[in-house]
């Protein structure tokens, strides 16, 4: 499973990139708004740091405007993937953009059937939201498992991006469920690095070394 980072904070992306694990980035209008910067400027900088799919979301809710915005975003860099919300107008926009060779990531997926429709419309990626489903008492990982099984059964090559990832267990569950990608906040990536026994082991190695060499 590939690891994306879910942020528009350039410094977080830069730090995570140095770990050597990032294969892509997902952003959304809310994340970019937090940065208080021009969307084009932020995306260009992100593309200069990570050489992989960079998801940038349209703001429009009607097909024609989604397509127009998508075309403009796609001009920024060859790695741009257009994030489109799951809705009727969104599916129409995905079909048009896909016919023009522009990759899309259909977001706000909360059911396997939504994922199927998005894939058949031509989406390159679908993003089921784990955390938000958990919030309403529906285990988010269940739809990731169902989507992965359905896509494998029918030979659908649309990639699954597990999104709304809240903790390391979401990442592990996604990997075991067959998700192709998990897009992860920076703080969760840092949690994945840590383990109490690793820290204790490192401390003991240093203590033993210092004791042996009288340091």
Swiss-Prot record:
Entry keyword annotation includes DNA repair: no
Keywords: Cytoplasm, Pentose shunt, Schiff base, Transferase
InterPro entries reported for this sequence: Aldolase_TIM (IPR013785), TAL/FSA (IPR001585), Transaldolase_3B (IPR022999), Transaldolase_3B/F6P_aldolase (IPR004731), Transaldolase_AS (IPR018225), TSA/FSA_arc/bac (IPR033919)
Organism: Clostridium perfringens (strain 13 / Type A)
EC number: 2.2.1.2
Protein name from the UniProt record: Probable transaldolase
Gene Ontology terms, MF aspect: aldehyde-lyase activity; transaldolase activity
Localization of this protein: Cytoplasm
Name of the gene this protein is made from: tal
A GO BP annotation: carbohydrate metabolic process
């Amino acid at each position: 499973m590939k690891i994306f980072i879910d942020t528009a904070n350039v410094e977080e992306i830069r730090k995570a990139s140095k770990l050597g694990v990032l294969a892509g980035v997902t952003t959304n209008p809310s994340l970019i708004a937090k940065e208080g910067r021009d969307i084009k400027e932020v995306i260009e900088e992100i593309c200069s740091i990570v050489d992989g799919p960079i998801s940038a979301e349209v703001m429009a809710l009607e097909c024609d405007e989604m397509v127009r915005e998508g075309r403009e975003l796609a001009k920024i860099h060859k790695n741009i993937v257009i994030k489109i919300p799951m809705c009727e107008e969104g599916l129409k926009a995905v079909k048009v953009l896909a016919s023009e060779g522009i990759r899309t990531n259909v977001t706000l997926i909360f059911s396997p059937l939504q994922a199927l429709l998005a894939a058949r419309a031509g989406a390159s990626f679908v993003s089921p939201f784990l955390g938000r489903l958990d919030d309403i008492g529906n285990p988010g990982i269940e739809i990731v498992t169902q989507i992965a099984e359905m896509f494998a059964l029918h030979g659908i090559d649309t990639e699954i991006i597990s999104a709304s990832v809240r903790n390391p267990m979401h990442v592990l569950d996604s990997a075991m469920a067959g998700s192709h990608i998990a897009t992860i906040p920076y703080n969760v990536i840092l949690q994945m690095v840590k383990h109490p026994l690793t820290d204790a082991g490192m401390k003991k190695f240093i203590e033993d070394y210092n004791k042996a060499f009288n340091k």
